[in-house]
Structures are given as structure tokens and as C-alpha cells.
Amino acid sequence: MLFVEFRFFLFFLVVFAVHWALRGNTARKVWLLACGHFFYACFFIGDPVAFLGQIRDGDWAKMPDGWWFPAVLWASTIMDYVVGRGLGASREERTRKLWLLASLAANLGVLCYFKYFNFFVTSAGAFLDWFGLHTSLSTLKIILPYGVSFYTFQSMSYSIDVYRRRLAPVRSFLDLAFFISFFPQLVAGPIVRAMTFLPQVVEKRTWASVRVRDCCTLFFIGFVKKACVSEFAAQIADAFFAEPSKYDHLSSVLGVLFYAVQIYCDFSGYSDMAIASARLLGYELTPNFDFPYFSRSITEFWRRWHISLSTWLRDYLYIPLGGSHGSKLFTYRNLLLTMLLGGLWHGASWTFVIWGGMHGVALIFHREWQRSTGNAGALFKKTMAVLAVPLTFYWICLTWIFFRAAPLIDEKTGAIKATSLEMAQRIFKAFTLFGAHGSKSFGLDCLAVFAVLALVHWLNSRRIFTAAWQRLPDWAAAALLGVGTELAILFVPVKYKAFIYFQF
């Protein structure tokens, strides 16, 4: 059930109405917990009537793939609730460490099995083959549960914060279960911290705190980003990444640029709609984006892009590794290791590891650059101030090539004609000054569309639209949102692509 689908609006209308009609806070939490698991189930049960019939008849062979996904979610929740209670009752540091280790082992074990088992097996097999030790390692048919990368991180952060004594363990299992399975952020974030969300769960939400106009505006912006802009950009990006060698150099550049547009509008659009939905129910989620493509350095980019993940990696991985407390080499090791693991978190592929490594190297380079140019002249600093944003964006686009690259499959035989790494290499050459030699072209109209999107995005980053919007009376804002929604619907495709981050 995607946020841009009509059935989600019907679902949310029922959730919203019942939530605010209920008087007691406990009743509301039970209701939203049930809604969260219903929302989660909609991703795999298919036809609800047929699914219930299969359960009634015990016809397990015909059950849809992933019907057991909720069991993984419940197991993670129960595990960390027990760990939290154990940490709260323990006084000896050794015992507390054992409790924390149990949480980390369980959550990371689940993540490694479902997401990385086959990756590790195939990588080990390729490594042994490289040394001439031919093996026949077998992979398993493993289905990745939706949202497992997100809710395991949330669940782990709760146990870690309780261990660090930054958070008291929750007494009510309902509170923790609600926190982990709150449907706006369940499948693709933002990754919410227990320290910021659990206090909201304890306190009853009030309608007076809900700014309906702001929520509807934010949801509309997210809807347009995903349903209109991202879906349009995907047509160009998908066409190029499927056959990069057939396009000329300008079209190769446009193909990568439109993927940058696609992934930003897709993911930030989802985050906008998730945050808006939560706010309409009285809850606040972590902001996830702050115009990252206008960053003046890769360091600033990671303060603006996927903020909930970057801060999670900082607080629960980079700092525990030692952070910047130590030698320069020690600090750079921590940076690179954090980004490599951050890349691997996104997917079980070496292209994601390379993507993370490129960001890690760029972060190290930026620190060295700051040290070496600290005493540079005024003219040099002004020149770099002008070039900082385009150079940073160019590097980000280079990294997106490895993030997006997928293996080339023969449609007739199903054989792999080129691996993800080989495709990334071809696209990298086409995008950079090496040039491309194909004849297909997207045309100058696509370049004009990109320029218009960039201009609108820049104006929005300057809060120009926000200031004008806030001056409008409520009736005018409501009318414009209604007209805007009708116009947006005219441009939406018949069938939406799933949000990109659902696969992670």
C-alpha cells in the first residue's frame, strides 16, 4: 500500500477518524498498533479475502510469499522489550553487556541472514574461485522482509540507549510495539529514535497541537515529488541505465542527473508524506532531508541527506568506534568503515559497498582539504565558494552510478550479460569526460525540464514559496491545494513504481 495510492487515502481516513474519536490513550495506541500491522500486511497478502480463505482452509502451499513477515517484526520487538527489562533490572556491568550483546546478536543476525547470507556465500565462492579453489557453494531462496533494515535499527537503538542509561526501559510492551510498528515510518523510515518517540507515546496526543494546513501542504509536496517528478525522472533514468552504451554523451549525463532527481524526489517525497501522516495523528517524526543537493561539501551533504540514517550511523557506529578522538589515521579509518557499512546497509551488493566507500573517501578528502586550505587567500576561497556546490553535486552523481547500476539480464534466456559492476563501469565512462558513442538522445527538451526543476528546487530552498504560502488565508490555501491535487493527478502514471527505499 503506497502513500500515493487511492486505497491508502481510504485507509488513512479510517485510521484518522477512529484515532481522534477514541478518548483513551491506551485505546488509541492499540488501534494504531493494529493499523500498523494491517498496513504492513497489505504489502504481501495480495487479495485479503483469498488470504483469509487460505488460512481458514489450512492451504499453506498457496499462501503468498512473505506471509510470515510479521513474525520477524514481532520477534524483534519482543526480543528488545525483554532486553530492555533485563537491562533495567541488572546492576552488574558484565550482565548488562550480555543483555546488550543478546540484542545486537539477534537483530544483526536477522539482518545478516535475510539480507546478506546469499551475498556472503556468492562473494566467498568468487573469492575462492579467484585462487583456483573451485567450489559449489549453494545459496538459499531467501525473501527479504519489508522494512527489516529500518525496524531492526530502531529496535537496536532502543536497547543501546537503555544500556547507555540515556533512556529508562519501557514498562508497557504496548508502547514499544507501537513505537516500532508505527505505520508512517514502518517500511522505509525515517529511522525514529526511542528517546524522541517514546515520550510522545506516553503522553496523550491533543487535536489542538495538530496544524492541519501545514500537514496537508507537506503531504501534497511529497505526493507531487513522488507521483509526478520522480515517476517522470524514472522514465529517463531507467531507459538510460538499461542501455547506457546506446546514448550520446549529453544524454548519458542527463540519464544520471535524472536518476539523482528520481531518488531524491522518491525518498524525500516518501519522508514528507510519512511525516505529514504522523503529524495528522499528533506524532512527530525525525526530519530526513534538508535540500542536500545544495550542499557545499560532502560533509554537509551527509548532514542534509537521509538525516535519520546518517545520525544513527554517527551515534551508534562512528562514535563507538572512537570517532575523531585519536590520531588522524584512526579517525579516517572510522570514517571509511562507517561509510562502507552504511553502503552495505543499503543492499547486498559490491556496488553499494563501493558507493559507501566513495563517500567515505570524499569525507576524508574534505577534512584534508580543509586543513590544507585553511590559510589560503581570499580570492581562492571566493572561487571555491562558487564551485563548491556544483563540484559536490558532481561527485554525488558519480556515486549514484554505482548505487543505481543493476545487472544486464538477457530477456530470452535470463542469463546475466553484464554484472552490476560492469554496468557501473560502462555508465561511469559514459557520464565522465571519456564520453559515450551511442546515437540515441533524450533531446534538449529533457535538459530544459531538468533546468526548470533545478530552478524551482533552488527557489524552494530559499523559502520563497514558503513565505508567500504562509501569507495566504486558510480558505485560499485549501482551494489551491484542491486545484493542485487535481492537476497533479493528471500527470500521475497509471501504475506507480514502488518507493526505491522499500527494497532496503
Residue spans of the language-model regions?
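Membrane-embedded transmembrane alpha-helical bundles that form the catalytic cores
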Residues: M1-Q503
